[in-house]
Amino acid sequence: MQTISKASSATSFFRCSRKLSSQPCVRQLNIRKSLVCRVMKLVSSPLRTLRGAGKSIRVSKFCSVSNVSSLQIELVPCLKDNYAYILHDEDTGTVGVVDPSEAEPIIDSLKRSGRNLTYILNTHHHYDHTGGNLELKDRYGAKVIGSAMDKDRIPGIDMALKDGDKWMFAGHEVHVMDTPGHTKGHISLYFPGSRAIFTGDTMFSLSCGKLFEGTPKQMLASLQKITSLPDDTSIYCGHEYTLSNSKFALSLEPNNEVLQSYAAHVAELRSKKLPTIPTTVKMEKACNPFLRSSNTDIRRALRIPEAADEAEALGIIRKAKDDF
């Protein structure tokens, strides 16, 4: 088993240590322990313990105080670059899955753990987030939960949720947040007790989703809603896009030292075929260009007019990312 320890040579604000699993494609995050770790003042996130294929992976990254919870989160790669997330409550044995693009990887994981599936949660209607719904529902009798606005577009939906709803997953309160922009009916699912949010395709690490159905103004409001959460909130998004996103972000802010360190960390993880997710609210506020549309360097790089408001600037940044 290999161990990696990395510190940023430029700023020394970043430190990461991992034990690599022989099967890096599946990672399970256990946020039961409470630990304290401080790594500089710029960026922080909870200390997490990940487990995969029976071998433990220890991650110390932008650390502060972790949360105490019986909720386990297993990252499951699907399709080309999608992530689904299996949720398991240790106390009750309840299992859910967020955004199953396809059924087979979820079934394989549940077989390995000997677990059943109770809930299927969808952030939006796109096929690469709902493609496994019907097969999983038929196999396990799981209930499908999604946006009320998308109730006619989510396969097999049983329960429709709207902004402000609070739903209980095995004793864990889930706050439903409307986060349109990528699609009109997109929702994000926030677990305050675990400081974790599932953002689907609204927010990625260092980027946001394409504006297929919404407007820059809607996307800006959605991103602001997500980043109003505590800084140590872990963000679980729908795709592994972070490496390419980091290249775009650096093209706009080449002198951002936090971004430089994070981009180097991301490149190292991807070179070992390891996930870059979760990220944190604090990291994204420091590095994500879509959260920094008022930044002078970004505006200068894209020739965004001084008079342009944040929504207009976000639209210009999104167009530049589409063409990058």
From Swiss-Prot:
Annotated metabolic or biological route of this protein: Secondary metabolite metabolism; methylglyoxal degradation; (R)-lactate from methylglyoxal: step 2/2
Domain of life, source organism: Eukaryota
Catalytic activity of the protein: an S-(2-hydroxyacyl)glutathione + H2O = a 2-hydroxy carboxylate + glutathione + H(+)
A GO molecular-function descriptor: iron ion binding
Key word Hydrolase present: yes
Residues bound to Zn(2+): 124, 126, 182, 201
SMART domains in UniProt: Lactamase_B
Classification via PANTHER family: HYDROXYACYLGLUTATHIONE HYDROLASE, HYDROXYACYLGLUTATHIONE HYDROLASE GLOB
Assembly with partners or alone: Monomer.
Protein name: Hydroxyacylglutathione hydrolase 2, mitochondrial
Native source species: Arabidopsis thaliana
